[in-house]
Amino acid sequence: MVDRLANSEANTRRISIVENCFGAAGQPLTIPGRVLIGEGVLTKLCRKKPKARQFFLFNDILVYGNIVIQKKKYNKQHIIPLENVTIDSIKDEGDLRNGWLIKTPTKSFAVYAATATEKSEWMNHINKCVTDLLSKSGKTPSNEHAAVWVPDSEATVCMRCQKAKFTPVNRRHHCRKCGFVVCGPCSEKRFLLPSQSSKPVRICDFCYDLLSAGDMATCQPARSDSYSQSLKSPLNDMSDDDDDDDSSD
C-alpha cells in the first residue's frame, strides 16, 4: 500500500502542505518514494515541562516541530531517520498517560498521546515503518541510544552528589550519557560521544570514570517505566518556544 501511495498526487500534495507549514526554515521533505503515513499532536516531555508538539510520521522519517498556528504554521523542525528509532511503552503515572519512549543514538525522549487508542496506533505504525525499512535495507536495529533526560522538575538537588541544591545561581546541567540532572562541580568534564556530537559533551563525573575505564553500558540507567513522580501539574497545552532539551546544558 505504501509503494502504491508513493507516487500518488494526494501524497505529494499532503507532503507539500507540511513543507509549507514549516516555511523556508524547514528542510525539504518531498523525495521519491516517501509517503506521509499520519500526523497529530503529541505531548513531548521536554526539559522544563511537557509541551505540545506536532508530529508527522513518514515511511522513512519522523518529523516534529513547535506549533505556532495549528495546521498552518510550525517551526523548529526536527527530522529523525526511522531506521535508527526504537520505541518502548511507558507506564501511566499521574497526569502523564498513554506514553512511550522514542529512542535514537543522538536523542531520546518521551511522548504522550491523548488516548490509549491513539498511543497504540502511533506505536503500531512506527514499528511497522521501522520493520519495513530495516527489512529493505538489510540493516539491524540500533542497540545504542542516547539517554532520556530527567526533567528539571524531578531534581531539586544534584542527582550525583545529593548535596548541591539548585537555585537561579546554581544551575541544573544534564549528563549527556546518563541523562541525570547534576550540578556544575559534578559535571565539569567532557567526553566524546560520537553518536551525539562531533565535539566532547558534558557528562557527570560518574559516567566519565566509567567511560574512561571502557565500561560504556553501566553509565546509562534503565528508565523506561517512570519519569515524573514530581510532575503533578496538568500537561501544558501549547508553546511556541524552543525545545528546552536542545540547550547546551
From Swiss-Prot:
The modification Phosphoserine is found at residues 16, 239, 248. One of its GO terms (cellular component) is early endosome. Residues 221-233 have a biased composition (Polar residues). It is a peripheral membrane protein. Residues 221-249 are annotated as: Disordered. The PH and FYVE domains may be important for TNF-induced localization to the endoplasmic reticulum and for enhanced cellular sensitivity to TNF-induced apoptosis. The FYVE domain is important for binding to the endosomal membrane. This is Pleckstrin homology domain-containing family F member 2. It comes from Homo sapiens.
